[in-house]
Amino acid sequence: MPKRVLQGVVVSDKNDKTVVLKVERRYSHPLLQKTVRQSKKYKAHDENNQFKVGDFVSIQESAPISKDKRWVVLTSEAAG
């Protein structure tokens, strides 16, 4: 089974070798008939501490690295 890849914005880089990302998904609500935005935060492994707050990055699923980290930062995307 392929590993999931998500895109999000770095909201915290205060931890060593860890960044916190906010991943937003949009979907159409069946009853309200409007587009709803829902976000979730993920902790991802950043080996070289190279990503800063505000960066738009891609993360990939991995084996558990710690209690909360199960994602690895792949690349930085162009913001836009």
UniProtKB/Swiss-Prot annotation:
Q: Choose one Gene Ontology CC annotation of this protein and give it.
A: cytosolic small ribosomal subunit
State the name under which the record lists this protein: Small ribosomal subunit protein uS17
GO terms, biological process: translation
Sorted UniProt keywords: Ribonucleoprotein, Ribosomal protein, RNA-binding, rRNA-binding
Q: Which gene encodes it?
A: rpsQ
Q: Which SUPFAM superfamilies match?
A: Nucleic acid-binding proteins
Origin organism is Brucella suis (strain ATCC 23445 / NCTC 10510)
The record, for CDD domains, names:
Ribosomal_uS17
Q: Its function?
A: One of the primary rRNA binding proteins, it binds specifically to the 5'-end of 16S ribosomal RNA.
Q: Please give the subunit comment from the record.
A: Part of the 30S ribosomal subunit.
The record, for NCBIfam families, names: PRK05610.1, uS17_bact
One of its Pfam families is Ribosomal_S17
Q: Name one GO molecular function term.
A: rRNA binding
